[in-house]
């Protein structure tokens, strides 16, 4: 009887210890998987951004920004909120009817970081004039992003010029 009690006690102890040890491994892998998922979702902002600009889809473009996002589009040209961001894009050269640009990007220059519910995104934009086949403009975007209500959105956009190095 004594051996049976010791055996049951040891068995219970093994079950408890193995259950505790197993949870830390799965949570570490879950964290790694969540991080990879977040990096992917943030990188999709760049894809949506360039697609919206190429198609001149202002609603899609503005939907990538948080409601209270800020955008700096040049020295002294900082705006806040989706409506002001919308107006900057609608008044830009790329949105004019006579402008036929395709927004391309060198994927290898894409940089994404994530830290919990916040992250950063950097990309270049190469605007190709469809009529001439030549590069019409080079720009870059440095973005702060945040997960808001389960969706990654741009909270701060800093546009700049980029140098094309071949």
Which residues make up each language-model segment?
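Positively charged n-region of N-terminal signal peptides that target proteins for export
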Residues: 1-4
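Bacterial N-terminal signal peptides
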Residues: 7-17
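Short, low-complexity N-terminal intrinsically disordered segments enriched in polar/charged residues
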Residues: 20-64
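Short beta-strand edge/turn micro-motifs at domain boundaries
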Residues: 27, 138-166
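Hydrophobic pocket/interface hotspot
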Residues: 49, 61-62, 69, 81, ...
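A mature extracytoplasmic/lumenal domain signature
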Residues: 65, 75, 123-127, 143, ...
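Surface-exposed, charged secondary-structure patches
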Residues: 84-133
